[in-house]
Amino acid sequence: KSLLIQGYNYTDDYIDSFTVDGQGGGNLYVSSPQSGGGGSVCCVSFNQGVPLPIKLKVRWMGAYCMEYETNMFGRTSAYRKGLWREAEALAVDLSQGKPRAMEVHIFPEGHVEAAITPGYSPPRMVLPRTEKYQRPGSPKTYPDCTDDQLQQATP
């Protein structure tokens, strides 16, 4: 059986991309009191006979730093570089026998929770969001990239 992937972003930053066991989950704006920040995308495999909870590997691009490049004319341009984070989550079954979605909840400190559900659930954290899809008071400036961050490959 295939389950829809539904993401919930409780961090202060836009998540450019996330995956669940290698399956693309799309992008996620910061959550609002009514929404997790993204829609549903297809799909992650689920075998109903497998013992639960299921261990999942979740990766997301949700941290950023500034990278600078100087061209041959001496002009320097700044670019926002996305940095990948990764966590394991144990997916629990909350579907009441009607599995339709795999929810992935990404919390500010990098903790991830997952659940198999019968459909869309309300966010687990109720956080404010501005009309520009940002957290109120969250600065949108990023630190300069370190050498290690500049070496991080983008999958």
Annotate each PLM feature.
Residues D13, Q48-G49, N71, Q151:
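Secreted/processed peptides and extracellular or luminal domains of membrane proteins
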